[in-house]
Amino acid sequence: MTPGTQSPFFLLLLLTVLTVVTGSGHASSTPGGEKETSATQRSSVPSSTEKNAVSMTSSVLSSHSPGSGSSTTQGQDVTLAPATEPASGSAATWGQDVTSVPVTRPALGSTTPPAHDVTSAPDNKPAPGSTAPPAHGVTSAPDTRPAPGSTAPPAHGVTSAPDTRPAPGSTAPPAHGVTSAPDTRPAPGSTAPPAHGVTSAPDTRPAPGSTAPPAHGVTSAPDTRPAPGSTAPPAHGVTSAPDTRPAPGSTAPPAHGVTSAPDTRPAPGSTAPPAHGVTSAPDTRPAPGSTAPPAHGVTSAPDTRPAPGSTAPPAHGVTSAPDTRPAPGSTAPPAHGVTSAPDTRPAPGSTAPPAHGVTSAPDTRPAPGSTAPPAHGVTSAPDTRPAPGSTAPPAHGVTSAPDTRPAPGSTAPPAHGVTSAPDTRPAPGSTAPPAHGVTSAPDTRPAPGSTAPPAHGVTSAPDTRPAPGSTAPPAHGVTSAPDTRPAPGSTAPPAHGVTSAPDTRPAPGSTAPPAHGVTSAPDTRPAPGSTAPPAHGVTSAPDTRPAPGSTAPPAHGVTSAPDTRPAPGSTAPPAHGVTSAPDTRPAPGSTAPPAHGVTSAPDTRPAPGSTAPPAHGVTSAPDTRPAPGSTAPPAHGVTSAPDTRPAPGSTAPPAHGVTSAPDTRPAPGSTAPPAHGVTSAPDTRPAPGSTAPPAHGVTSAPDTRPAPGSTAPPAHGVTSAPDTRPAPGSTAPPAHGVTSAPDTRPAPGSTAPPAHGVTSAPDTRPAPGSTAPPAHGVTSAPDTRPAPGSTAPPAHGVTSAPDTRPAPGSTAPPAHGVTSAPDTRPAPGSTAPPAHGVTSAPDTRPAPGSTAPPAHGVTSAPDTRPAPGSTAPPAHGVTSAPDTRPAPGSTAPPAHGVTSAPDTRPAPGSTAPPAHGVTSAPDTRPAPGSTAPPAHGVTSAPDNRPALGSTAPPVHNVTSASGSASGSASTLVHNGTSARATTTPASKSTPFSIPSHHSDTPTTLASHSTKTDASSTHHSSVPPLTSSNHSTSPQLSTGVSFFFLSFHISNLQFNSSLEDPSTDYYQELQRDISEMFLQIYKQGGFLGLSNIKFRPGSVVVQLTLAFREGTINVHDVETQFNQYKTEAASRYNLTISDVSVSDVPFPFSAQSGAGVPGWGIALLVLVCVLVALAIVYLIALAVCQCRRKNYGQLDIFPARDTYHPMSEYPTYHTHGRYVPPSSTDRSPYEKVSAGNGGSSLSYTNPAVAATSANL
């Protein structure tokens, strides 16, 4: 190959490489899709396993959109702050950047802004009238309020300080972020605040009378206590100060947030509050006569009792403080949030509250006669009872307090949120509420006659009872406090949030409420005659019943409290949020509400005649029924409480949030609401005639029905409570948030709402005539219907509650958030709303005539319809609830957020809104004539249309629910089983989806989009690809008919809001229109709508409807729409006129799918380039050939030799002659030898040549 032909090959190779690179870029930039135009969305057709099919997908629509009216952008990291609003009258600004701060409101009248940047600080309100701003940037500080009248700002940037309030009247700011300061007490008479953020300073008290501030940010300073009478503030930022007690008579507040402070008691007569947030402070009792509050948030402080006569509150949030009792006569509250404080009782006569949030404090009882509340949030405090006669409340939030009963006659409420408190009953005659959320506090009863509330959220506090006659509340948030019962006659509430408190019953006659949120408290019954509510949120409290005649509410949020019934005649509500409390029934005649949020409390029934509500949020409480005649509400949020029924005649509400409470029914005639949020409470029905609401949030409570005639609401958020119905005639609401409660219906005639958020509660219906709302958030509660005539709302958020219907005539709302509750319908005539957020509740319909709203957020509740005539809204957020329709005539809204609820329609005539947020609920339509809004946010609910004539708005933000959905201008009728349609946001567009063909039950998907394009009035959408549980993706046949429909809404005015999809006006109208069309075109051929546009002229609505080809024509589209105009006017308040329908071509440019794909275009370009290169090469080759002919032949290698070496010539020639170069005629003698060069200039000897030739 010549050099002239090489260069084109190099050029061709270079161009080929560049072409391949360029083609790859094009191919990768167009992955099966095309770019959007400014006004129209085009859809690509991805590869499919089937040919001749159009699969319309959208890569720009999102099924997740901000709620209506929300200006939050998608994907924005928003941190939840449950309650950051300033109190009434406050001029404070709202908390900025607050993270999970349940209560950061400044006190009433305070001008301080709420906590700014606070993290997980449940309560940091400054005291009432305080001008101090709340804690700023505080982390996990449940209560940082300065004392009443104090001007000091709350702890700023404090970490994990449950209560940072300075002592009452103190101007000193609470201890700020102190860690491990064993004793940081200022000297006696000192006005200096305790160690502030001190680190490892064994003794940081300033000298007596010193005005110097303690070491600030000092590390390992053995003694930083200010001297007695010193006004200097304690060391700031000191860690590990063994003794943080202020001296006797000192007004300085104790160390705040100190860790590992064995003794943080202020000296006798000291007014300084005990160490706040101290960790591992064995003894944090203020000295006798001291007014300082006990250590707050101290960890491992064996004894945090203030001295006798001290007014200081007990250690708050102390950890492992065996004894946090204030001294006798002390007014200091018990340790709050203390961990492992065996004894946190204030001294006898002390007014200090018991340890609050103490962990492992065996005894947190305030001393006899003490007014201090029991330990609050104490962990493992075996005895947190306030002393006899103490007014301190029992430990609040104590864990593992076997006995959190206030002493007999105590007014302290039972342990609240105690875990594993076998007995949290307030003493007999006690008015203290049962342990609330206490964990494993064997005995947190306040002493007899004590007014202190039981241990609240205490952990493992064996005995946190205030002394007899004590007014201190029981340990709050204490952990493992075996006995947190207030003493007999105590007014302190039982341990709140205590864990593992076997007995949290207030003493007989106690008015303290039962343990609230106690875990594993076998007995949290308030004593007989006690008015204390049952344990609230207690875990594993076998018996949390208030004593007979007790007015304390049952254990609230108690876990595993076998018996949390208030004593007979008790007015205490049943255990609230108790876990595994076999019996949390208030005693007979008790007014205490049943256990609230109790877990595994087999029996949380208040005693007969008790007014206490059933266990609320109790887990595994087999029987949480308040006693007969009790007014206590059923267990709220109780888990596994087999029977949480208040006793017959009880007014206590059923168990609220109870888990696994087989029977949480309040007794007959009880007014207590059914178990609320109870888990696995088979029977949480209040007794017949009970007014207690059904179990709220109860888990696995087979029967949480309030007794007949009960006014208690059904179980709310109960889990697995087979029957949480309040008794017939009960006014208690059905179980709310109950899990697996087969029957949570309030009894017939009950006014209690159905179970709310109940899980697996087969029957949570309030009894007939009950006004209790249906189970709210109940899980697996087959029947949570309130009884007929009940006014209770249907189960709200119930899970797997087959029947959560309130009884007929019930006004209770349907189960709200119930899971797997087959029937959560309130009874006929019930006004209760349908189950809200119920999961797998087949029937959560309130009874006929019920006004209860349908199940809200129910999961798998086949029927959550309120009964006919019910005003309850349909199930809201129900999951898998086949029928959540409120009964006919019900005003309850349809199920909200229901999952897989085949039928959540409120009954005909119901005013309840359709299921809201329901998942897989085939039918969530409110009944005809219902005013309830359709299901909101329902997923896979084939039919959640409000019935014809219903005034309820369609389903809002429903996913895969064929009925109606709000929050979206586009819906999908999806025929697949458990198929999910995915969408992504596009410019002002709405999703458009294609159904699968694997089921006969249609489902719908509604999603709202807020992303906009350049056009303010143009809407476009791309059909989302739907998927199902089948191996092949669902496909749509190529035959699709599109119709352009426009109409005028004459009663609305067009404004700029309809040009901005983020406005409430725009979203509401768009949602209403979407839902309306879902109701109009219900046949299987309807595929969805898109391109909703609003124009001036009143309001002109233009949109595009899609149907399967051949299923409908223009005339039918217009006819069906005109027939529904009157319904739209009544339901959506839309006066429609000038309807125009026309057949239009496919608006989404689906034909583009038949074109050349991107890779094909890239390949075509590559081929074109290669062809061009070949043409260039051929042209170059032709040019070279032409040039060669024009310029002659260049002989690079000539054939002739021009040089011959002389060696070829002979040296001697005899007959040689000269041969001329041009001579051709040679003689043989003159020829040149071929071997001699062949040159014409050579001489040849003929003889030699001949001889050579012949050789």
From Swiss-Prot:
Residues 55-75, 960-970 have a biased composition (Low complexity). The modification Phosphoserine is found at residue 1227. Sequence repeats lie at residues 61-80, 81-100, 101-120, 121-140, 141-160, 161-180, 181-200, 201-220, 221-240, 241-260, 261-280, 281-300, 301-320, 321-340, 341-360, 361-380, 381-400, 401-420, 421-440, 441-460, 461-480, 481-500, 501-520, 521-540, 541-560, 561-580, 581-600, 601-620, 621-640, 641-660, 661-680, 681-700, 701-720, 721-740, 741-760, 761-780, 781-800, 801-820, 821-840, 841-860, 861-880, 881-900, 901-920, 921-940, 941-960, 961-980, 981-1000, 1001-1020. Changing residue 1203 to E: No effect on nuclear colocalization of MUC1CT and CTNNB1. No effect on in vitro PDFGR-induced cell invasiveness. It is found in: Apical cell membrane. A motif (Interaction with GRB2) lies at residues 1203-1206. Residues 1233-1241 are annotated as: Required for interaction with beta- and gamma-catenins. Residues 38-54, 90-102, 971-993, 1001-1033 have a biased composition (Polar residues). It is linked to MUC1/CA 15-3 is used as a serological clinical marker of breast cancer to monitor response to breast cancer treatment and disease recurrence. Decreased levels over time may be indicative of a positive response to treatment. Conversely, increased levels may indicate disease progression. At an early stage disease, only 21% of patients exhibit high MUC1/CA 15-3 levels, that is why CA 15-3 is not a useful screening test. Most antibodies target the highly immunodominant core peptide domain of 20 amino acid (APDTRPAPGSTAPPAHGVTS) tandem repeats. Some antibodies recognize glycosylated epitopes. The alpha subunit forms a tight, non-covalent heterodimeric complex with the proteolytically-released beta-subunit. Interaction, via the tandem repeat region, with domain 1 of ICAM1 is implicated in cell migration and metastases. Isoform 1 binds directly the SH2 domain of GRB2, and forms a MUC1/GRB2/SOS1 complex involved in RAS signaling. The cytoplasmic tail (MUC1CT) interacts with several proteins such as SRC, CTNNB1 and ERBs. Interaction with the SH2 domain of CSK decreases interaction with GSK3B. Interacts with CTNNB1/beta-catenin and JUP/gamma-catenin and promotes cell adhesion. This is Mucin-1. The lineage of its organism: Eukaryota, Metazoa, Chordata, Craniata, Vertebrata. The gene is MUC1.
